[in-house]
Amino acid sequence: MKKYTLIATAPMGIEAVVAKEVRDLGYECKVDNGKVIFEGDALAICRANLWLRTADRIKVQVASFKAKTFDELFEKTKAINWRSFIPENGKFPVIGKSVKSTLASVPDCQRIVKKAIVEKLKLQSGKANDWIEETGAEYKVEISLLKDQALITLDSSGTGLHKRGYRVDQGGAPIKETLAAALVQLTNWTPDRPFVDPFCGSGTIAIEAALIGQNIAPGFNRDFVSEDWEWIGKDLWNKARLEVEEKANYDQPLTIFASDIDHRMVQIAKENAEEAGLGDLIQFKQMQVKDFTTNLEFGVIVGNPPYGERLGEKKAVEQMYKEMGQAFEPLDTWSVYMLTSNENFEEAYGRKATKKRKLFNGFIKTDYYQYWSKVRPQRKKTENA
């Protein structure tokens, strides 16, 4: 089967998490800023779209070349065997971006690439004077220029991979599903341990934890634009979806709690969990974080609390951080992970983090504060085990 260069785009700071996911699928990869690059066949395109929890999109590299003039961009784009990617009736919108490049006008670059593809497809079909009917499946082309290096790709995902298909409602400013999955994967949580999100909002972090806990592919409940691509075909997509079903561990018991101070958000979170088919796995409750108590041990708490960025909110938010620190202080077997842009978090919480990791929540620069618990003792095997 033909091999392709595939690009999993990733938010800044999450590339290493995406790379681990790619390797877990069985593909060697290399990490670059904002992307993870790997080689794979058409089945790999299906698998990556279905399984990668933290990537934004899966792109197929068509070509990469130097381009300092519009003529150069046109001729090198036209030289590509476009018929091997786009069928006769394929719809191919062209988007673009240019960074630190001679060809700085993105609209002009898009127009030239579009024209070059049209001319090549006409030439390859023997219909040089005919109009190209773009009535079929979509093959979105991107021309990306960085320091005069042109990269042409096809977007195989369609809607961004953060769109899982379970969000019925979202309330205020929800965390992206891809970032929520990364927050879970950056912890020491395993499915046999309790998991808590005390700022659940619309339930995203808890839902992503449940998907991870039962090894349910994040793309199981949605469609992808490349499902209609002729050169991949329905059979490969069916094979990849069958793998998804076979690898899911629906019998894995989970202990997941999610709470929020706002009863309306708790209701939205419940509805989203039901839509994901996980309603029975997550226990939701309206509660302030300061009231959290538990007799369970060796659990993991992950939260995306309010940041206090709005005028007049900072003092109240930092008081809440203080109360949270007091509530969590007795939980010496629990690990705590909090994402916030508030630089006073550690002082308000009352303890220095074991580790901090810089992440972006959308365009907001944040730190992921990690408080590691004491080491969980290994379970002793009995002679008859």
From Swiss-Prot:
Gene3D superfamilies, sorted: 3.30.2130.30, Vaccinia Virus protein VP39
The protein's Enzyme Commission number: 2.1.1.-
An example Gene Ontology molecular-function term: rRNA (guanine-N7-)-methyltransferase activity
Signal peptide (residue range): none
Keywords: Methyltransferase, Transferase
Enzyme kind, highest EC tier: transferase
Keyword set includes Methyltransferase: yes
Assembly and binders: Interacts with the RNA polymerase core.
Entry protein name: Putative RNA methyltransferase YpsC
